[in-house]
């Protein structure tokens, strides 16, 4: 299944706020109206919606998300927590969380068009897994810096997660540590996502 490129507002109306996909928010009460129209949700549908929330927020294909679930399942610790850490430490998400891109699709575009350096080298893979002490910066070119400056200027002031440091005047961010689960940028029940996939196999 390919990455979603359809109307974004339609998705947030059904699934709730997805800040990685769009900075628009559903109108208050719209999810309650949707629920009353559709009646009581089945357990399968609840798990499916949590999975879709994760997929659309991080802008993943079905195959990519399944791959991350399998990697998380083989790692030490809670599969759900490891899954969120893997997704949060992607380069496109780090750029978004730093405010250097307005959305995750916007961050992906910056990376694909070779505007971003990691530790002084161009990285053009949005799924690149960032590590503690990685430095993320704009290329030393006017266009690259202008794109990031536009995003920094238009981003609403929000508390930066404690695993990141932003140096806006240098168009640069630093990864301090692996993200703590309380700083994940999406309201999600990750256990339902893991359950969804465990029942598919």
Curated annotation (Swiss-Prot):
Matching SMART domains: Ribosomal_S4, S4
State the Pfam families in the record. Answer: Ribosomal_S4, S4
Q: What is its main location?
A: plastid
Q: Where is it found, in Gene Ontology cellular component terms? A: chloroplast; small ribosomal subunit
Q: Name one GO biological process term.
A: translation
Instruction: Name its cellular compartments.
Output: Plastid, Chloroplast
The protein's GO terms of the molecular function aspect are: rRNA binding; structural constituent of ribosome
Q: Which UniProt keywords apply?
A: Chloroplast, Plastid, Ribonucleoprotein, Ribosomal protein, RNA-binding, rRNA-binding
Q: Which domain of life is it from?
A: Eukaryota
Q: Where is the S4 RNA-binding domain?
A: 89-149
Region annotation (Disordered) maps to 15-44
**Which PANTHER family does the record match to this protein?**
30S 40S RIBOSOMAL PROTEIN, SMALL RIBOSOMAL SUBUNIT PROTEIN US4M
The UniProt subunit note reads as follows:
Part of the 30S ribosomal subunit. Contacts protein S5. The interaction surface between S4 and S5 is involved in control of translational fidelity.
Job of this protein:
One of the primary rRNA binding proteins, it binds directly to 16S rRNA where it nucleates assembly of the body of the 30S subunit.
NCBIfam families on file: PRK05327.1, rpsD_bact
* Stated family: Belongs to the universal ribosomal protein uS4 family.
Q: How is this protein named in the record? A: Small ribosomal subunit protein uS4c
- Per the record, the gene is rps4
């Amino acid at each position: 299944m390919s990455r979603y490129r359809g109307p974004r507002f339609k998705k947030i109306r059904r699934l709730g706020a997805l800040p990685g996909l769009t900075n628009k928010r559903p109108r208050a009460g719209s999810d309650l109206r949707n629920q009353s129209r559709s009646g009581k949700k089945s357990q399968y549908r609840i798990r499916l919606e949590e999975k879709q929330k994760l997929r659309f927020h991080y802008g993943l294909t079905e195959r990519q998300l399944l791959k991350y679930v399998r990697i998380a399942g083989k790692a030490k610790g809670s599969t759900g927590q490891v899954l969120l850490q893997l997704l949060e430490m992607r380069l496109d998400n780090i750029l978004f969380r730093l405010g250097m891109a307005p959305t995750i699709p916007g961050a992906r575009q910056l990376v694909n068009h070779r505007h971003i350096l990691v530790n002084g080298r161009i990285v053009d893979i949005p799924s690149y897994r960032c590590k503690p002490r990685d430095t993320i910066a704009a290329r030393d070119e006017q266009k690259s810096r202008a794109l990031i400056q536009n995003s920094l200027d238009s981003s609403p002031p929000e508390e930066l997660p404690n695993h990141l440091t932003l140096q806006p005047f240098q168009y640069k961010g630093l990864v301090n540590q692996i993200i703590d689960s309380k700083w994940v940028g999406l309201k999600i029940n990750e256990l339902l996502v893991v359950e969804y996939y465990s029942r598919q196999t």
